[in-house]
Amino acid sequence: MLKYILLFIRKGKLMKNNHNLLMKMKNLEKFSGAIKRCVAIAMASMLFATTGFSLDTHPVKAQEVSSSADKIEIPEISKDAFKKYKKISGIGANTILGADFTYYQQCLEWGKSYKNYMSQSVDNIFDYVKSQGINTISLKVAVNPTGENAYLSLENAIKTLKAVKASNTNLKTNLVLLYSDEITYAGTQNLPADWEKAEKEEQSVTRVESAKTYTRETIAKLKQAKVLPDIVTIGNEVNWNFLGITDGEGWEGWKAMGDISALLKKEGVKNAVSIAAQPDAASVKYIVQKLGYASVDYDYIGVNVYPDNNTNSYIKSLKNEVESCAPDKQLIVSNVEYERVNEANTANVYTQADSIYNLLEATIDEKNAGGLIYNEAAYVGSWKSFFDDEGDAQVSMAIFAYAQGMRQIQAEILINTEMILV
């Protein structure tokens, strides 16, 4: 049986001194099969040597094939690497398979484009990521972001939510309200500048009142735009001093979360809270206890993780703790990312995919639908995203489909002017 070697050649990306070699390779069709195979192999070897291409380190890009519920496109060389991934036991419609698209509008403003694994432009990015197993689009929103934080604007989020809705993909949406003018993290929970000013004025408005007013106004704008999300996440890593009044024995911040969750529930929106991982997984019961005392009506408890060698075992322990103290809540990983490129050359799309699969599996069992939201998934050019600096999708994204048992039935490799068949 003839074996096919597919080499993807992107126009304008090869060194000029390979131009003649490429032209000769494209003219091979005039020769007989045996001669063509021998000559092509020799030429391909020369091409690899002069361009630095390597089948060992670079995924080969194959022509896109049609997708369906149980068929996804995977570049030919990636098939063997992905064969080991089975459908995760317990995964289902309620599992959150999320991609953070906060940077999406910013990337469009920068002139970036989104392509499939074969460098072909996709008609609809949301239809495309759904075909790769994603079921939730997540967006972070700041109160009054400016400068380098402008990408966090509500206006950008509404544009993206409208695009998701127009795609008719039935993707779920999650909006993370940061209650700050910038990204918030564990030790960085800066109050919006206007709220801080209002609190200091003679007729002071408390930060809690400002937060509730902001929530009402945001929901009103979303409803007016007809893009009310399925889920709203209240803050980010809120166990670390939400609104600056939650740390230690602070109580008002927790109570504010309860009031905000009540506002959201009236609108029929599911609630999530995002926490920073505690050193001891058992400590989550104290967070759940405080949420209960403050009457926070939430559906999901998300934990942000910064992966290390113990992350998966930690998440399994955390899942057991949540199932014990809050059995009606769904634990998810609300923020995570893995390198696919690094300076040490120890990361690639396959290590990235493997890390995602193992973490996702750790969140799921018969009691917890689990899931994760992949941070900055749509940030074109990031070493941790699903799109490289040219906008090409990375095969690691398909791990979400494999985790659901959506396997490619048959590879259909076609020849066009940008491909060489050996």
What are these regions (language model features)?
Residues L154-E155, Y185-L291, V296-Y298, N309-N320, ...:
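Active-site cleft segment of glycoside hydrolase catalytic domains centered on the general acid/base Glu
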Residues L97-F101, I137-L139, T173-L177, V232-I234, ...:
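Hydrophobic faces of well-ordered beta-strands that scaffold small-molecule active sites
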Residues L2-A42:
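Bacterial Sec-dependent N-terminal signal peptides
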Residues T102-Y104, A142-N144, V176-S180, I234-N239, ...:
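Active-site beta-loop-alpha junctions enriched in small/polar residues
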Residues S68-Q132:
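N-terminal carbohydrate-binding accessory modules
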Residues E343-S355, A362, E366-V422:
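Aromatic-rich peripheral "rim/lid" segments of glycoside hydrolase catalytic domains that contact
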Residues S121-T184, E249-K270, I315, K319:
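Aromatic-lined substrate-binding rim segments of carbohydrate-active enzymes
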Residues F48-S68:
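Sec-dependent signal peptide cleavage junction
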